[in-house]
Amino acid sequence: MTQKLHIKTWGCQMNEYDSSKMADLLLSTHGLELTEAPEEADVLLLNTCSIREKAQEKVFHQLGRWKELKKNNPNLVIGVGGCVASQEGEHIRHRAPYVDIIFGPQTLHRLPEMINQIRGGKSSVVDVSFPEIEKFDRLPEPRAEGPTAFVSIMEGCNKYCTFCVVPYTRGEEVSRPVDDVLFEIAQLAEQGVREVNLLGQNVNAYRGPTHDGQICSFAELLRLVASIDGIDRLRFTTSHPIEFTNDIIDVYRDTPELVSFLHLPVQAGSDRVLTMMKRGHTALEYKSIIRKLRAVRPDIQISSDFIVGFPGETAEDFEQTMNLIAQVNFDMSFSFVYSARPGTPAADMPDDVTEDEKKQRLYVLQERINQQAAQFSRRMLGTEQRVLVEGPSKKDIMELTGRTETNRIVNFQGSPEMIGKFVDVKITDVYTNSLRGEVVRTEDEMGLRIAQSPQEVMNRTRKEDELGVGRYHG
């Protein structure tokens, strides 16, 4: 009988990506097929996130439910991975001794051996080490699930913002070799993927080794990915302002595959708070990046992350954040009330903003962002938008759904052969979380792209010195 795997995932897109890789890996090594029902599973995996408050308690609450399943099925293998496992591995083992496997984000590729060890009689396995890039070398070939795909290009972060656990849970920055990234994307393109989202905790810090011992910058990687036949849309997340260099802005100038949408977290608009957060940039420097981007891409829309109620944040500091929001005119945000993360420098600061004040500030901030987002949506009414068709609409399976370049969901009537392709849609209705439209042009009528060699694309950034020797600039 086929064995089953159930994975519960919390947190960021990197965690979602990791979970999909776990599923692919265990299907190839153990024949484990995914199930949505934990009670059907032979292996249960919890992929955790430590960003939100009370992350530990959430983990133990979930494990308590699974403990009952283990009582009924002693052969059930339970594993805990992700950032909470990385931080609290030994604590999990002591408090929940029925957990068999504890693994970190960088050791998920060792899951097959860990499962074999447990089934071979070992009582428990804990591996939360940071073996650098080995993880990617041991994963199976990518499998496309629709026309969009995530591809991890780097892991970890060296920035050590005072509120953040990522450097402690995922380690320092490690970039995948450029050839590995391009090969994975080419494989996905052959399977019908049209849009790729490059992932990393600090994605624009990418410095990928090349086959000849050189280093490929993030800007160069973007151009190489854009040149892969079949890839017509390119996104990336999450980036950091201090790594957002002019050579990346140049890619927006001349690479139409790179979408006119950017998620660039700023966290606060007060320089005093940014300094306490150890962000490494000022509000003015952030605005300068946006100004340069809009000079080359006037239609680009920006989303961000904000933390309100950081230790020491005054009403005046918050007002400066609101001013920044108005000046940049963000289209969307992921906004959170500050809560201390164990082991971070900010956890030692006095948490002196009251919970009521934090909630009030969050409400005010989100209301402003929602107003700005609604204005952007209203401006789209009557316009034509290019939509990548992802499949049937969740609201009405007789309709199709897809996303615009600026990440808006659009629902419309269409035929099944449109799935996985682009259509141009005239926007007829605007709702809070989606748009509605009518198809005016199919992909066959677009003349989408002229094939270009990777060398032609790279030549956009290539200059020659006085001796005729090529050199990259940026």
From Swiss-Prot:
Enzyme Commission no: 2.8.4.3
Q: Which InterPro entries match?
A: Elp3/MiaA/NifB-like_rSAM, Methylthiotransferase, Methylthiotransferase_CS, Methylthiotransferase_N, Methylthiotransferase_N_sf, MiaB_methiolase, rSAM, rSAM_horseshoe
Q: Where is the Radical SAM core domain?
A: 143-375
Top EC class for this record:
transferase
Query: Where does the sequence pass through the membrane?
Result: none
Q: Name one GO molecular function term.
A: metal ion binding
The segment(s) forming the TRAM domain are 378-441
Q: Which residues bind [4Fe-4S] cluster 1?
A: 12, 49, 83
One Pfam family name is: TRAM
In this chain, [4Fe-4S] cluster 2 is annotated as bound at 157, 161, 164
Family recorded in the similarity comment:
Belongs to the methylthiotransferase family. MiaB subfamily.
Protein known as: tRNA-2-methylthio-N(6)-dimethylallyladenosine synthase
User: What gene name does this entry carry?
Assistant: miaB
